[in-house]
Amino acid sequence: MKRAYTSTILQRTLSLLAYTAPAMKLTRITCLLSLVAFCSAAVFAQSSFTVGTATAAAGQKATGTLEIPAAADAATSIPVVVIRGSKPGPVLALVSGAHGTEYASIIALEKVIQTLDPAQVSGTVIILPLVNIASFEQKVPHVNPVDGKSMNRFYPGKQDGTQTERVSYVITKQVVERCDYLVDYHGGDIDENLRPYSYWPKSGDAKHDAITRDMVLAFGLDHVIVWSDRPKDPAASRYLDNTANTRGKPAIAVEAGYSGTVQTDDVALLANGTLSLMRYLKMLPGAPTMVEHPVWLGKVDTVASDQPGIFYPVVQRGTYVEAGMKI
């Protein structure tokens, strides 16, 4: 009823403005823009946003779960937080814990949840701080121990598939398809020693790529891996960020952390990067802190040993190397 009433007011005002003298053109436009903004804010204030069991009205923060029913294997329950700002704006999805032992990224989103004040937010933030529950509980790196699959390799998922596929399906439907922007967080697994970096997924669409490029620069990690060979088929998107990008929702992936540890600096990079990105998206007041001199990495090489054993590095992570160097 309230939306219909607002619409009627807008229609009547437009009719009235149409008959106003030409000399009042600028005033008419100003009034119309003000009325549209007022109506948009009024509708936003009256509406709530629900993901899973979490429902937040304007100016509220709500917690709940995404319930994944049992099928060929066990059910699972994923925590979700919805932060509904006090003012209209885009919907931003933040997802971490696809690999449950990448702790820095999980803790970073917990920090973001605690930091964000709905009164200061324009728009809505959906946060999934821990997706791979079994991996976290059993301390299993890389995969979901329930079905042995990585939770960042089976998007957009299957409604009747294994647990990993069902989780991916629900996230696609409940989160990806309802957001405007997305960030996928990683934190250096138990057997990884990584320097902080972002992924810039180039789609070939100039307008879309300009947005995702600005997103990685606004996030603030100065090393950026450029991915231009991601699957183009939305039905076989494979990665979470790619699932959003193939559906027209600008998305990036970020990583900070190493060896399954929680270091204050890594957590701060991810948490502060999130706030800077939200400023770029006009979801928080203030200006973003953009990377001024990014290092663009266009190629990733893997150096494999031809013998089994234990690897003892002689260089620190982030060290520049060249052919022939002992690493």
Positions of PLM-derived features:
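Generic detector of N-terminal low-structure segments
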Residues: Q11-R12, S40
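Structured catalytic-domain cores with a bias toward divalent-metal coordination
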Residues: A45-I327
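Bacterial N-terminal signal peptides that target proteins for export
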Residues: L14-L17, A21-C31
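Bacterial N-terminal signal peptides
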Residues: C31-A42
